[in-house]
């Protein structure tokens, strides 16, 4: 049996060597994806995003607010405008993401306790930029009122402790668990890169099986395995499994041990998750081809499954907030279970037993070929390829 397995795997290596699709989809594109996403946000968060100022007060207080806003890491004051219309036009031209409006009489209103209003406008076309700039603009607006209050209380002879107690009666002790730096690279690369690698696995698996029919090699392939479909599939996918596993595990080593992404869960769940992710995607590809023994249909199913995974895995929008039918359908995607295991066992370091249902789901995906593998044998021996 092992001799047959070896010869089938060797035959598959020859096929892969002659077909550049394998080289690009299994090595070049995954490496390019890793480099692209890990360097896309290497600084962690966007910095120096352009902001405009409409200062109609021209006072010491307004200038102080502008200087403080410009000092924030994510904000950079790039221009001043005479009125709201000019600033709005700049947002429409994508020259700035937001602008701060300081109306005339702001400083006088603060000193007279008349509660003047300052306004800020921001674009949420880009969700990350909009939310970060909203935070900075809201903070600077709060600081403006606090600065005036501090000046008045200081003039009345209050101590610094008394001033702080008056301005902030309740102190907030804030802790961001898992990712204290709010590093977007930690969120982006750990989901997008594995998802794209899994998409390549989804596509290559039915492609490699379907081309046996397309190029009239199916009978020879089954003859080498002694008409044993399990042996035929195992030998054919063994080289692909080793290559994809190497790419996947090297990616995980790169982000966790070279780039230093947080992984308090340790190495065991990282390695096990990488192995099960590759095997589950290959198994789904085998299942899809056995369900519909057609190169085009099986690849269409797998591409649909891989692309929808990005929306339904819960990384960008929580699955439990979606409608109940969609939440149930989400469990049919390997990437959903990958993401849940990653954020529970690797990112947060919770025990693996907490994600036992998701580990079991990946194992269940690995057993899917049992349902359709005999249909693959029938297709290889009886069916003819129809372009």
Where would I find each of the regions flagged by the language model?
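Extracytoplasmic/periplasmic domains immediately adjacent to an N-terminal transmembrane anchor
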Residues: 1-186, 374, 378-381, 386-387
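Residues that define the loop-to-transmembrane-helix transition and helix capping
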Residues: 20-21, 230, 296
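Hydrophobic alpha-helical transmembrane segments of integral membrane proteins
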Residues: 26-27, 190, 314, 330
């Amino acid at each position: 049996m092992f001799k047959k397995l070896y010869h089938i795997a060797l035959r598959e290596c020859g096929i892969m060597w002659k077909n550049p699709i394998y080289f690009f989809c299994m090595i070049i594109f995954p490496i390019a994806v890793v480099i692209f996403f890990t360097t896309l946000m290497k600084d962690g968060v966007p910095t120096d995003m352009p902001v405009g100022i409409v200062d109609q007060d021209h006072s010491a207080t307004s200038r102080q607010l502008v200087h403080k806003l410009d000092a924030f890491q994510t904000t950079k004051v790039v221009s001043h405008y005479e009125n709201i219309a000019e600033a709005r036009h700049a947002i429409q031209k994508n020259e700035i993401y937001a602008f701060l409006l300081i109306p005339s009489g702001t400083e006088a209103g603060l000193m007279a306790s008349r509660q003047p209003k300052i306004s800020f406008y921001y674009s949420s076309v880009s969700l990350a930029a909009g939310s970060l700039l909203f935070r900075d603009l809201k903070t600077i607006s709060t600081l403006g009122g606090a600065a005036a209050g501090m000046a008045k209380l200081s003039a009345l002879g209050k101590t610094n402790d008394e001033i702080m107690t008056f301005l902030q009666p309740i102190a907030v002790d804030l802790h961001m668990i898992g990712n204290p730096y709010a590093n977007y690279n930690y969120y982006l690369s750990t989901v997008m890169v594995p998802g794209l690698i899994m998409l390549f696995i989804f596509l290559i698996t039915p492609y490699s099986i379907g081309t046996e029919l397309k190029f009239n090699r199916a009978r020879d392939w089954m003859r080498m395995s002694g008409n044993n479909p399990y042996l035929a599939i195992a030998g054919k996918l063994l080289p692909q499994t080793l290559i994809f596993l190497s790419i996947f595990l090297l990616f995980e080593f790169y982000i966790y041990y070279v780039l230093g992404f947080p992984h308090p869960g340790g190495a065991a769940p990282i390695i096990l998750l990488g192995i099960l992710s590759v095997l589950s995607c290959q198994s789904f590809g085998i299942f899809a081809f056995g369900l519909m023994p057609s190169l085009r249909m099986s690849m269409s199913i797998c591409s649909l499954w891989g692309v929808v995974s990005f929306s339904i895995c819960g990384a960008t929008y929580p699955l439990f907030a979606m409608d109940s039918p969609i939440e149930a359908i989400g469990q049919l995607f390997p990437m959903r279970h990958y993401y849940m295991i990653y954020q529970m066992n690797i990112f947060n370091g919770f025990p693996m037993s907490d994600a036992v249902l998701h580990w079991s789901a990946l194992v269940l995906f690995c057993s899917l070929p049992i349902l359709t593998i005999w249909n693959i044998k029938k297709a290889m021996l009886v069916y003819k390829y129809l372009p």
